[in-house]
Each structure stands twice: as structure tokens, then as C-alpha cells.
Regions:
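Conserved donor NDP-sugar-binding/catalytic core segment of glycosyltransferases
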Residues: 93-132
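Conserved small/polar residues in nucleotide/adenosyl-binding loops
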Residues: 252-258
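Short aromatic/hydrophobic "clamp" motif used to bind/position activated sugar donors
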Residues: 81
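Short, well-formed alpha-helical segments that are part of the catalytic scaffolds
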Residues: 9-23
Length: 263
């Protein structure tokens, strides 16, 4: 299991994220931390961990979390890939439960879980941020065809920090995040994967996903960010048709029907 943690200036939270990996009941992992040229104390905090399973790379120039994540993927040697953001927290049994599922169900390309929302003080905030909580909590298992239709109509509802990806499946769809879709790179990757592989949603909240109101934070809303995300998701939807192979004619038909509604 290779775990990718991309960080930029998260000195307040990164230790909590790292500790949640170290405390996993599943122990056969490597944690690859890519620091994207942080200017706070992040690098000192990262270097304070002496666990031999932790690998680090410190970038000299800030790029983007997607670029940093791709660097981590290139370093990964595990059969599975998981990604944790530097401000999120995993429950102790997350990896054990998901790896067991993936071992027993080899047809699936990705296993996700549901999440609890936490605030800046690491307190549960499912009610406070009910919209984002319900987005992730109401997700249910679907066929590949149903997922494609859902993604095209509704956008992303899957939490990146909850995913365990089979590395062979990731390599089958290009192996990396697409840097042409920075800001919606998770959504675009899920699109590519779902066309090729079924995915599974575990009905347990195995992640504490941090949501902040502060301006400029990754998880915060702003009008400009809403517009940018909408435009990016529209681009991803359009690109999806290029990914569909000729043998998936039914998915093309469903996709065209959906595109006619949002184009």
C-alpha cells in the first residue's frame, strides 16, 4: 500500500494527518510525503518523523497539489494507492477494511468510503456543514453505466481522501492526475476509472474530512471558485467522451443524452 500525502503550508494539521496513517491497524504501507515548497514549519514537522516507512520529497518550487501527487505516484511501489490530504484524518481501521475488500473483490478498481466532516478545531461538523456532508453521505453503489450518467448530470460526489485505488487500474487509465484539469483533477480521474472499472462505496465513515470557511483554503467556498469549478467540471464532462471506447456504445448514448441537458 502506497499512501500519497501532498502538503503545502499545513503546519497546523499535517501532524494529525501523519499520525492517523501511523495509527492504522493495517501496517504494510509506505507513506510518501511530497511537500510543495512550504514556507511555514511543515518541513520541520515532516522531518521529525523517523518511521522507516515514511519517504519524503521537498520541492523547491510550488506547483499544485495535483503535480505533487503525481510525483508521489511515481515513487509508489505498492499494489494499492491511497491519498490523504494534509488536513484530513483517517480512522484507524480504514486501510485494513478497504484492502480486505479489494483483496476479496478483484474486479473493482477503486474502493471509497463515506466521511465525517470536521472543522478547523477537528470537531465533528456534519450539521454545521450539512450540504457537503450530505453530498458525500448520500452516495450509493451504482453500475458503471449509472455512475457515468450520475457524474455527467451531478458532478463529483466522491471524497478523494477515502479512496483506495488498485495501482494496476490506475496505470490502465494513464497512471496520473491530468494536469490539464487542475482544480477538478479528482473528478477527471474518477471519470477515467469508472469507464474501465466498477467502483465500490463502503457504507462506513472512515475519513474525517476537514472543511474550512476561511478564504483561500482548499476546502473553502468563494464565488470565483464556484465559477471556476463549474467551468472545469464542464470541460471534464466534455473530455469524458474521448475516453469512451467504441465497444461502450451504450455509455456513449447515455452520455450524449446527459450532455444535451448541460451543453
Amino acid at each position: 500500500m502506497s499512501i500519497i500525502l501532498a502538503n503545502y503550508n499545513e503546519e497546523k494539521y499535517i501532524a494529525e494527518a501523519i499520525e492517523s496513517v501511523i495509527n492504522q491497524t493495517y501496517t504494510n504501507w509506505e507513506l510518501i510525503i511530497i511537500d510543495d515548497a512550504s514556507t511555514d514549519r511543515s518541513q520541520d514537522i515532516i522531518n521529525s518523523y523517523k518511521d522507516s516507512r515514511i519517504k519524503t520529497r521537498f520541492c523547491k518550487k510550488n506547483n499544485h497539489v495535483a503535480y505533487a501527487s503525481n510525483l508521489g505516484i511515481d515513487m509508489a511501489i505498492g499494489e494499492y494507492i491511497a491519498k490523504i490530504d494534509s488536513d484530513d484524518v483517517w480512522e484507524a481501521e480504514k486501510l485494513e477494511k478497504q484492502v480486505l475488500f479489494m483483496e476479496e473483490h478483484t474486479e473493482y478498481g477503486v474502493c471509497f468510503s463515506k466521511v465525517n466532516i470536521i472543522d478547523e478545531d477537528s470537531k465533528e461538523a456534519n450539521t454545521k456543514f450539512s450540504d457537503i456532508f450530505e453530498l458525500f453521505d448520500n452516495v450509493k453503489n451504482r453500475s458503471q453505466e449509472e455512475w457515468i450518467k450520475y457524474f455527467l448530470k451531478n458532478g463529483n460526489c466522491l471524497c478523494n481522501a477515502s479512496a483506495v485505488i488498485r495501482k494496476a487500474a490506475l496505470e490502465c487509465v494513464g497512471g496520473h492526475y491530468n494536469l490539464a484539469f487542475v482544480g477538478a483533477e479528482d473528478y477527471e480521474l474518477w471519470m477515467r476509472l469508472i469507464i474501465k472499472f466498477p467502483i465500490y462505496i463502503m457504507d462506513e465513515r472512515l475519513v474525517r474530512y476537514r472543511w474550512e470557511e476561511a478564504a483561500g483554503k482548499i476546502s473553502g467556498f468563494s464565488l470565483g471558485k464556484i465559477y471556476a469549478t463549474f467551468n472545469l467540471q464542464t470541460m471534464v464532462k466534455s473530455k469524458m467522451f474521448d475516453y469512451m471506447s467504441d465497444e461502450r456504445s451504450e455509455e456513449r448514448r447515455v452520455g450524449k443524452e446527459c450532455r444535451s441537458r448541460w451543453s
